[in-house]
Amino acid sequence: MDEEYDVIVLGTGLTECILSGIMSVNGKKVLHMDRNPYYGGESSSITPLEELYKRFQLLEGPPESMGRGRDWNVDLIPKFLMANGQLVKMLLYTEVTRYLDFKVVEGSFVYKGGKIYKVPSTETEALASNLMGMFEKRRFRKFLVFVANFDENDPKTFEGVDPQTTSMRDVYRKFDLGQDVIDFTGHALALYRTDDYLDQPCLETINRIKLYSESLARYGKSPYLYPLYGLGELPQGFARLSAIYGGTYMLNKPVDDIIMENGKVVGVKSEGEVARCKQLICDPSYIPDRVRKAGQVIRIICILSHPIKNTNDANSCQIIIPQNQVNRKSDIYVCMISYAHNVAAQGKYIAIASTTVETTDPEKEVEPALELLEPIDQKFVAISDLYEPIDDGCESQVFCSCSYDATTHFETTCNDIKDIYKRMAGMAFDFENMKRKQNDVFGEAEQ
């Protein structure tokens, strides 16, 4: 362990690896450690399949029908990338795309009255959708046109709406949209987990719907991308970036103590040695006394031998179950991927259902999602506590990431990364400033 570093990073989750990569590119001297022998922390992909069975204490191990264990890479935290979202921009600006291959997720679906429907997000799809009646379609189309033309710097596009003060509830009212359409707009397009957004100023919701439409416009089938070989590839891509710029990596390295002087971090002790630093980044598991519990998420990993019904036999898709449809406060999500993404044996599918826990019986809460997946070959149930830091770290210079939430995209994770960056660097994270080269995520790869 070299003595002096600008930044020490503990844990190789996605948030930590992206920050470590960005800090290295910015010329900081970085030491990155993880107590685990593998990359990814909470956001790793588990391989071989035997390892997943062990992790969930299923001692009998996988049956032969599951195929070769090495063909599996199972994500512990299910998320997709928005094609036009912040994580893709981070991948592009750092050129980490050169280490990864992506596929477009084949479909985005929403649950209504016990059935699933394709999410309409263009005028043409909206007019053809069975989700709404004829008059509702016309009103929804008007709303989509309004959102597409909306420009916060051009008051001529406002149509009497003030982006800073008009609530989203009032915007829906203005277009006379019914409850079902409001549900799917807020939850399947703007991707909110709850209905708290309705009474907030409408600008953020309008921008979220724009992000969905722009992401969809890039590749057509859905706005989501997924990396071949699983999400565990993402932290590793950023770890490579950090190493190229001189970052030092140590896996399987226990952390004995974080050393503080006068309330500020000065180093990390591991196996009797001390590495000194000016700033520390870590996930909540490294500093339990500096985080508080902010809720729980249940995630159920399901292995299937068939595509999900009514998805047109898609080999990947997302299903959103809006909370109002199942009398809840938070949405339920299903992410499905398969052998087509090199994460499962031939003919096998992985569907992960997740939601924010609201009761003392979390498994019952995700039942509406599990019903859509039947028959299920094997289930792995994980209930995780969500943690957030108790302070902003500016005084101690210890910057802690938040746990990964129940959403099925990385926008909230990217907000956390930008927020930590701002607190560490004293200035906002600027894509333009740092972007060295803009190219397509797919490079020359087929879509």
From Swiss-Prot:
Subcellular location: Cytoplasm; Golgi apparatus, trans-Golgi network
Membership in a protein family: Belongs to the Rab GDI family.
Pfam families found in the cross-reference section: GDI
Name of this protein: Rab GDP dissociation inhibitor alpha
Subunit annotation: Interacts with RHOH. Interacts with the non-phosphorylated forms of RAB1A, RAB3A, RAB5A, RAB5B, RAB5C, RAB8A, RAB8B, RAB10, RAB12, RAB35, and RAB43.
One GO CC term on file: Golgi apparatus
Function comment: Regulates the GDP/GTP exchange reaction of most Rab proteins by inhibiting the dissociation of GDP from them, and the subsequent binding of GTP to them. Promotes the dissociation of GDP-bound Rab proteins from the membrane and inhibits their activation. Promotes the dissociation of RAB1A, RAB3A, RAB5A and RAB10 from membranes.
